[in-house]
Every structure is written in structure tokens, then in C-alpha cells.
């Protein structure tokens, strides 16, 4: 009670935070008129002065990196707003500046859909870009990385900052002006998109200087090397690509191969919930072929097809696990003619059988994956998008390939891996944006140390969120969805329907084309009453309604389908989903990142109109572009008013997701920036969530109430049951992610040690000192191990002599000493002399340093690869320790530490042994050794694949093989060289 009173008096923590930031926004606003009075040239010069001040003043630079809001940060934010007005005709709202300040401070800004997150990121990106330490803007797909970099490019370029883009197809781009000479002129002549002295929040279309807008267009130009994108002040790319580049850098054999030259300074993660939570169970993995025969999966598949569910094996859908029953074990043993399936020699076979059961009974085609061109492609359950190149781990993908009768790709061995959780913790400052983060605030704080600040909307939110309609069967649910779409489509109201799978997506699409079903619905009395009532409310005559109804019944309901199979036109479909009469069916959050504007997007429409006239939008003249844009503005404004009168966009969800956040994201597609809109979920008791978590109680209630077919139930008890089910699943998933993080953090410490050592070797730090350090360590360890007694009289020196001979390749005299310390020191000095002789034999200190580097790097890489493989196996079996009353995590930490210590000792020993015994006559031979090692390394990388493998039962990434990428890179370089020659 007292807490509630205190909140009323002093406000919630979030309200206090927003209030604190408003003071800074007022300071930014005070600079607006002053900056507006400056010419373009003066503004550009001011930006350059500020850039120099931030990057050269070390103390100020550090304060900016830490996220302090200094007077320079205020000035940079004001400059960004002014640059956006002059180049794009967009002005940051106050709430967008608050969002930007939250990002600058290294927090998460929760901003509702349509509040302009893309523009919000520009202010913190510019001020942190001015430190010259690098800013990474992380998007969920390649298209958004390219689009956002190009769209916001004019702001950055105007203020003197360079922008790079990395894509998963291996291509790298730099943002450049389309016509640099024109821009130069426009800056000289003070040409602006937003007129001088105009201080309203939004610029009406008739006041936009369209010629100026076209002048400030940017384009993406391909760069020769990926490093170029990272050398820029700001780099756009996907989470996968930033992560894979980090791993590739740590597989590099020379300094020149490293691309992330600025390290990890500051990252702004767009759709932060999707990347840091939904994909947190996804380790990014670079792997090479492993020696496992794929024939075993064919045997397993043949066996599983003869087994019966519930008799021979059990399936737990909630926990996604499978087990053989006693009867099943005997049946398998009989079929395969073996005595004991659980014998150690059959462990791979047992594993393949269990994975095959999971492939057949837990993973469905067109829900969890699709088959295209003889390949099994994973579908992201959160977005409904195909994840090209990603493969399930642990043989599951191979089991599904056999099930579907497509070629089986061999299993892989890990070369390098990291989870997104640990990758993003590399950044000195991390920030993120999303429309829905509050429900996961605890996880953001606990795992990443990030606070969530909910940013107020620019205009009050007036969307109506209706209670769920719950039907007994899926069939009744789908009929009601079709009825809702039909009713609203007749009046021209745009409808967006969200489905959870491609299968549902395509099912609904066929129902909307089913004229027989549409007629049946149209003839129902309940539908006729609703139609009449809606027409009356909207003032539409019965004749008009009848005419439109007949038209729809004749042709079916025209609609756009958006799923993993039809992703090419994603942005275009979503951008026009708010037009009059538009019906869009999308899997979950497909199209996320593109706003649904009521009436449609004028710029997309203008491009479409030019294409219809046979004109390429990129090559259109200023006059053609201006004319198309004016017409597009007129059409969209007209349609916007009509859609508003109809109640705005209607969003229909067809199934509750495991996470409330995903449901909220779908609802959030309607009612952007104060627009009207409605949302409703139409669900059934046969949907997975209710079926697995508490649908029985609701089903009994429906039987008790004698609910007839086609009648929904609306009750608080049902809503509560759904919410409780979601909370249980969310808590379960959080624990899984937390556990994964705890396990990966053990490896993270080890990875850090190995990668730091690798980087030192590549950057040419004194390897010789490292070798001397190794020598001292090995001598100390061996003396203590082989001479356990303290008294020299009791020492048996033969084992030590044998070891020293094995190490150096020659007899080493053991000196007379008083104690172990003296022995260690004298042996160290003696072995150093032998090592110096070897150096003279090699030819020169420089040649020896290079040999040290190549040998240590090679041995370290081999040992780390084997260590990762050992850790994978350790992790698989560690959970069994729980049955013995031991904590698997503590056991894993202990054993992983011992394994790592042994690995490092072996690296030291093998490096010394190789260097002492190497037989090389000249420096040329050293270069040859180095060249051979590089070739071997290159072959390994060419065969490697990039994967994001999501634990046992899940999915995720591997864009193209590096072999393909390297080939493309070589081709691209040739083309660029040829182009340059032509120009010369």
C-alpha cells in the first residue's frame, strides 16, 4: 500500500528516468533555432570541429564511450536532428531523442512499433562514431542492414562520417553519395529538404523540397575488402555476421586477414529481444567435417519406421525429449542382431536412433523446416523465415535429411564457437531497441546487465485490444478467421493475419480462395447480422455492400502471403499492408523492421508507379521521380483518411505464442503513432500451447457450459489459463538460456586466453619471451613431478635426464645443486644456451622468431580444436552426474578447467619439443614451412561451414561455406580490377 502511494507521489522508476532525460532534451531543443540559422557549410564545419574535439581529447572521448551526457553529446544530438531535417526531411521527435539518450547510456529503449527506431539510432551512432572507436548497428537480416544504412546514410555522410555494411553473402558495402558533385553544390548553396525557419514537428508533403531530397540520396558501393566496412565510423550488419567475423578473425593465420580492426567498442542492437533472447540458445559455430559415417542414420531411420509410438518409445512434446521403452530396446536389438544396445560400442547407433525418433515425431515439415532443391532448410519459429545454411546439431539434421529422402551432409567438428550472450558481452558498451522488452527486463538485467527504459509514445496509443475468442477445434477457429477477414475486406479495411507456421499460413491462404466456404459463411444469419450492423455504423448502403460481397464470392479474397517461401517481396508487401482492401497473411514477425503505414508507403508506391511505366526508379529523371512521388503522396493521404474511418489496421492472431512478447509484437503492428487500430487473437483448444499446458480445464468448462459448434468462449478463466501457460513456458525457456550461458561462460574464459594469445602472435608481439616463459614453466613442472622429494640425496635423476633428452634431442648434464629452485634455474640457463645454438643453426634471430610464431600458432589451433571437441562430449554426458547427487555445472567447471590446463601444458611442451628438434637449413625453408601451414589453414577454412546450432532440440545458422565465399571474393576482386582498368 505504502509503495503504491509513494509511486503516485514520486512516480515509478521508469517515469523518473524519462523525467531526468527530458532535461537534456530541452537543452537539445534550445539549440535548434541556433543551428537552423547556420548555412549547410557552417553546419558541416561545426560537425568537423566537434568530431576533432571528441576523438583527440582523450578524457572527453572516454566519457562519451562510458555513456555520459556531456555538453558535446547534447550538441551532437542537435546536429544530427538538423542534418536529418536538411537531408531526409525528417525531424527527431522529443521521445526519439529520449530513446537516443537511453541508447547512448548503454541501456535498452523499449519503443512501440512505428515510433521510428531506425531514426532513433542515428544520434547515439553519430556521437559514438565521433570517438573513431567504431559503432556496430546490429539488425535481424541483411536486407534491413542495407536498407537502414542507405536510408540513414545522408545524415552520417553530411556530418562527415563513413558507413560500412556487411552481408552474409560475403559482400561488403560502403555508403556513398549517388552524385557527390551535386551534394557539394547543395552544401555550398544551402539547399535543404526541410525549409529554413519551419519549426513544426512534421513536414507536410507539399513543403518537402523533392529536388533536394533526390540530391541527398545515397547508394551502396561494393568494397574490395571486408575490413573496409569495419574501418568506417559506423558498421551495419546482422548479429550472425558480426559473430562469425569475430570467430574468423580468431582463426586467421596472418594479421592481414583480421577484419574487426577496431575491436568491440559500442553496439546498438535493433530488435534486441529477438537477438539477445530468442536467439540466445544459438551458439555460432564454425565447423569442419568430422569422421562419422552417415550410413548410421539410414540404418536408424529404417529401424524407427518399424517402431510404434507409446509402445516402443515415448515422446515428451513439452520438453522435446524421446526415450525407448524396454519393449522398444528389445525390438531394436532383435532387428539389428545385437546383444546390448546400451553397450559402449553401440553408443553412436543408439544416439542416431533417438535422433531419428525426434526427427519423425517432434519435427514437422512446413512447420519446423521446409525441403527446397533437395535440401532441408530450418524455419525460424519466431519469425517464420527460412534460415539459409543453418543446421541442427548433434546428428538431428542428418536424421531429418534421411527422413525426407534428400542427400545427407556429413556431421561437422567444431573449429570455433561462441554464443550470442558471450559475443555481445565483448562490447565495452551495449544498447538495444525493441517494441517489447519489459516482459524480459529481468533477463536483460541478469545476463547482460542492461536496464530497460520504456519510452513514451509520441502520440497517445488508441488501439483496441480485444479479449481472445477461444474455439473448441482448429476447424472452427479457421472458419472464424475467414469470417473476420471477409467481413472487414468487404468494407476495404486492411487486415493483417499472423500465423505461427508456414503450414498454417498456406492453409489460411487456400481457405481465403475457397469460394464454397466463403458462400457458406456469407449465408449464415450471424454473418448477415454483423454485415448489416457494420454497414450501418460506417454509413455504407446495402446495395454497395451486396455488390462488393458478390465480387468477393466470385473471385475469392485477394491477399498477399508472407512466409519463408515468399520472402523476396517481404518489405514491399508489409509496406503496402495498410492500403485500402489489403489482406496480408504473415508468419509471426515476418516483415519486422518495416512499418505498416495506413494508406501505404508513398516512396514504395512511387517506385512501383515508375516500374509500371517501364522506368527503373534508380535511373528516373528528377522530373519523373518528383511527379511519381507527388502522385503517390496524394493517393496514400487519401487512402489513409479512408482507412482511419474504417478503424485502422485490424490484426488477427491465430495462435498464442510461447512468449507473450511475440504476441505483443504482433498486436503492435496496429495503432502506430496514434493511429486507430484493433487486435484480436482467435485460438482453439487444439493449439499447441493450450493442448500442452492446461487446455483440459478449459475443455471441461466448454462441455459444462454446453458451448455449441462455431460458438466461441470469452472468459477471464480462459485468458488466465493462457497467460499462466505462457508464463510457465517463458520461465522454463529463461532457465534453459541461463544454464546455457553459465556453461558457455566456462568456455568463454578459456576462449579469451586462447584468442588473446593468438592475437599477440599475429600482431608480432615478442613470441620469444613467450617461448622462454614456456621453457621455465615446463622445467618447473617436470622437476616437481619427477623429483618429489626435497632432499637431493634422494633424487632419481634418470627420468629427468630421459625427459630432457626427449625435449632437446641431446644429452643434458644435470648440475650439482643444493635444492630444487637452484636446479630449475640452472637447467633453464642450460636449455636457453642450447636454444640459442639452435637459433644460430637456423640462420638469424628474425627467422627463428617467424618459426616460433608459425609453430606455436599451428599447435595452439590444433589443440584448441581438439579441446572444443572434448568439451562438446563432456557436456553431453555431464547431466548424468545429477543422478549421482552432483551439480553438473560444478562438475563441468572442474573438469573443463583440468582439461584446459592439460591442453595448455601440451601446447607448451609440443612447441618447445618441435623448436628444439626442428631441422631447417635456410630462411627459405622457414618461409616454405610458413607457406605450407598457411595453405593447410586456408584449406581448412575453405571446407569449414558457418553454423548456429541451437542445442539438442533446436535450430540455427550457417550462411554459405567459406569456400564459396572465397571464390566469390576472388571473382569480385577481378571484376573491380577490370572496372578500374576500363575507367583508366
From Swiss-Prot:
Catalytic reaction list: ATP + H2O + cellular proteinSide 1 = ADP + phosphate + cellular proteinSide 2
Top-rank lineage group of the source organism: Bacteria
GO molecular function: ATP binding; protein-exporting ATPase activity
Region of interest (Disordered), residue spans: 930-984
Entry's Gene Ontology cellular component terms: cell envelope Sec protein transport complex; cytoplasm; plasma membrane
GO BP, sorted A to Z: intracellular protein transmembrane transport; protein import; protein targeting; protein transport by the Sec complex
Membrane topology: Peripheral membrane protein
Keyword annotations: ATP-binding, Cell inner membrane, Cell membrane, Cytoplasm, Membrane, Nucleotide-binding, Protein transport, Translocase, Translocation, Transport
Chain residues that bind ATP: 96, 114-118, 595
Start-end of Basic residues biased regions: 972-984
Quaternary organization: Monomer and homodimer. Part of the essential Sec protein translocation apparatus which comprises SecA, SecYEG and auxiliary proteins SecDF. Other proteins may also be involved.
UniProt name for this protein: Protein translocase subunit SecA
Amino acid at each position: 500500500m505504502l509503495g503504491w502511494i509513494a509511486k503516485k507521489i514520486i512516480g515509478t522508476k521508469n517515469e523518473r528516468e524519462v523525467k531526468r532525460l527530458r532535461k537534456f532534451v530541452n537543452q537539445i531543443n534550445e539549440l535548434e533555432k541556433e543551428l537552423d540559422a547556420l548555412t549547410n557549410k557552417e553546419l558541416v564545419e561545426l560537425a568537423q570541429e566537434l568530431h576533432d574535439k571528441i576523438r583527440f581529447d582523450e578524457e572527453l572521448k572516454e566519457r562519451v564511450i562510458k555513456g555520459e551526457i556531456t555538453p558535446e553529446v547534447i550538441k551532437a544530438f542537435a546536429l544530427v536532428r538538423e542534418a536529418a531535417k536538411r537531408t531526409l526531411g525528417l525531424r527527431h521527435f522529443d521521445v526519439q531523442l529520449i530513446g537516443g539518450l537511453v541508447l547512448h547510456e548503454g541501456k535498452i529503449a523499449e519503443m512501440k512499433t512505428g515510433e521510428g527506431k531506425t531514426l532513433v539510432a542515428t544520434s547515439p551512432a553519430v556521437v559514438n562514431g565521433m570517438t573513431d572507436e567504431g559503432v556496430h548497428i546490429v539488425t535481424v537480416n541483411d536486407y534491413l542492414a542495407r536498407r537502414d544504412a542507405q536510408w540513414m546514410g545522408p545524415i552520417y555522410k553530411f556530418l562527415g562520417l563513413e558507413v560500412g555494411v556487411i552481408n552474409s553473402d560475403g559482400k561488403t558495402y560502403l555508403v556513398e553519395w549517388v552524385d557527390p558533385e551535386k551534394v557539394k553544390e547543395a552544401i555550398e548553396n544551402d539547399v535543404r529538404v526541410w525549409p529554413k525557419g519551419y519549426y513544426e514537428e512534421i513536414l507536410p508533403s507539399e513543403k518537402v523540397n523533392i529536388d533536394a531530397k533526390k540530391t541527398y540520396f545515397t547508394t551502396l558501393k561494393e568494397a574490395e575488402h571486408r575490413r573496409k566496412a569495419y574501418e568506417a565510423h559506423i558498421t551495419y550488419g546482422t548479429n550472425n555476421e558480426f559473430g562469425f567475423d569475430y570467430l574468423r578473425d580468431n582463426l586467421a593465420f596472418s594479421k592481414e586477414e583480421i577484419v574487426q580492426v577496431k575491436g568491440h567498442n559500442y553496439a546498438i542492437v535493433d530488435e534486441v529481444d529477438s537477438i539477445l533472447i530468442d536467439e540466445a540458445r544459438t551458439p555460432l559455430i564454425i565447423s569442419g567435417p568430422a569422421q562419422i559415417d552417415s550410413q548410421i542414420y539410414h540404418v536408424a531411420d529404417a529401424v524407427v519406421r518399424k517402431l510404434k509410438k507409446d509402445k516402443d518409445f515415448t515422446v515428451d512434446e513439452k520438453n522435446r525429449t524421446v526415450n525407448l521403452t524396454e519393449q522398444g530396446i528389445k525390438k531394436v536389438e532383435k532387428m539389428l542382431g545385437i546383444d546390448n544396445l546400451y553397450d559402449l560400442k553401440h553408443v553412436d547407433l543408439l544416439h542416431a536412433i533417438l535422433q531419428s525418433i525426434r526427427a519423425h515425431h517432434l519435427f514437422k515439415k512446413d512447420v519446423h523446416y521446409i525441403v527446397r532443391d533437395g535440401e532441408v532448410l530450418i524455419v525460424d519459429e519466431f519469425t517464420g523465415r527460412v534460415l539459409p545454411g543453418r543446421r541442427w546439431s548433434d546428428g538431428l539434421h542428418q536424421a531429418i535429411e534421411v527422413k525426407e529422402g534428400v542427400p545427407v551432409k556429413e556431421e561437422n567438428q567444431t573449429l570455433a564457437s561462441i554464443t550470442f550472450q558471450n559475443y555481445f558481452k565483448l562490447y565495452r558498451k551495449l544498447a538495444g531497441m525493441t517494441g517489447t522488452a519489459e516482459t524480459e527486463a529481468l533477463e536483460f538485467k541478469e545476463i547482460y546487465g542492461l536496464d530497460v527504459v520504456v519510452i513514451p509514445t509520441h502520440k497517445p496509443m488508441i488501439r483496441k485490444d480485444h479479449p481472445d475468442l477461444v474455439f473448441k477445434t482448429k476447424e472452427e477457429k479457421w472458419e472464424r478467421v475467414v469470417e473476420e477477414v471477409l467481413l472487414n475486406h468487404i468494407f476495404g479495411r486492411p487486415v493483417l493475419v499472423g500465423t505461427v507456421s508456414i503450414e498454417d499460413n498456406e492453409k489460411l491462404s487456400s481457405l481465403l480462395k475457397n469460394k464454397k466456404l466463403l458462400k457458406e459463411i456469407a449465408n449464415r444469419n450471424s454473418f448477415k447480422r454483423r454485415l448489416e450492423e457494420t454497414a450501418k455504423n460506417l454509413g455504407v448502403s446495402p446495395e454497395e455492400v451486396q455488390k462488393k460481397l458478390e465480387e468477393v464470392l466470385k473471385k475469392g479474397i485477394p491477399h498477399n502471403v508472407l512466409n519463408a517461401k515468399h520472402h523476396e517481396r517481404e518489405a514491399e508487401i508489409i509496406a503496402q499492408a495498410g492500403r485500402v482492401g489489403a489482406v496480408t497473411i504473415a508468419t509471426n514477425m515476418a516483415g519486422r523492421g518495416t512499418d505498416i503505414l495506413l494508406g501505404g508507403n508513398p516512396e514504395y508506391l512511387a517506385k512501383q508507379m515508375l516500374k509500371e511505366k517501364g522506368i527503373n526508379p534508380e535511373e528516373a529523371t528528377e522530373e519523373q521521380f518528383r511527379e511519381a512521388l507527388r502522385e503517390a503522396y496524394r493517393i496514400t493521404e487519401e487512402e489513409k483518411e479512408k482507412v482511419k474511418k474504417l478503424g485502422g489496421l485490424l490484426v488477427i492472431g491465430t495462435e498464442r505464442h510461447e512468449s507473450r512478447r511475440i504476441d505483443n509484437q504482433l498486436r503492435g503492428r496496429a495503432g502506430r503513432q496514434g493511429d486507430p487500430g484493433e487486435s484480436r487473437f482467435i485460438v482453439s483448444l487444439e493449439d499447441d500451447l493450450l493442448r500442452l499446458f492446461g487446455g483440459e480445464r478449459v475443455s471441461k468448462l466448454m462441455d459444462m457450459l454446453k458451448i455449441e459448434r462455431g460458438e466461441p468462449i470469452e472468459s477471464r478463466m480462459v485468458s488466465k489459463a493462457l497467460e499462466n501457460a505462457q508464463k510457465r513456458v517463458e520461465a522454463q525457456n529463461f532457465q534453459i538460456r541461463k544454464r546455457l550461458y553459465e556453461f558457455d561462460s566456462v568456455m568463454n574464459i578459456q576462449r579469451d586466453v586462447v584468442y588473446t594469445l593468438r592475437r599477440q602472435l599475429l600482431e608480432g608481439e615478442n613470441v620469444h619471451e613467450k617461448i622462454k616463459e614456456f621453457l621455465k614453466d615446463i622445467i618447473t613442472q617436470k622437476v616437481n613431478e619427477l623429483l618429489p622429494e626435497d632432499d637431493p640425496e634422494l633424487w632419481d635423476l634418470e627420468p629427468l635426464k630421459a625427459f630432457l633428452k626427449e625435449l632437446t634431442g641431446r644429452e643434458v648434464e644435470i648440475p650439482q645443486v643444493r635444492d630444487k629452485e637452484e636446479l630449475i634455474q640452472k637447467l633453464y640457463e642450460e636449455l636457453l644456451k642450447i636454444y640459442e645454438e639452435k637459433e644460430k643453426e637456423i640462420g638469424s634471430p628474425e627467422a627463428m622468431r617467424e618459426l616460433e610464431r608459425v609453430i606455436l600458432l599451428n599447435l595452439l589451433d590444433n589443440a584448441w580444436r581438439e579441446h572444443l571437441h572434448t568439451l562438446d562430449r563432456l557436456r553431453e554426458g555431464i547431466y548424468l552426474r545429477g543422478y549421482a547427487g552432483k551439480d553438473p555445472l560444478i562438475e563441468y567447471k572442474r573438469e573443463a578447467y583440468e582439461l584446459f590446463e592439460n591442453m595448455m601444458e601440451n601446447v607448451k611442451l609440443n612447441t618447445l619439443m618441435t623448436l628444439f628438434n626442428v631441422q631447417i637449413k635456410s630462411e627459405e625453408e622457414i618461409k616454405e614451412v610458413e607457406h605450407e601451414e598457411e595453405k593447410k589453414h586456408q584449406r581448412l577454412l575453405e571446407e569449414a561451414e558457418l553454423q548456429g546450432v541451437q542445442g539438442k532440440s533446436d535450430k540455427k545458422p550457417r550462411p554459405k561455406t567459406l569456400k564459396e565465399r572465397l571464390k566469390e571474393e576472388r571473382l569480385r576482386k577481378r571484376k573491380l580490377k577490370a572496372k578500374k582498368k576500363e575507367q583508366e
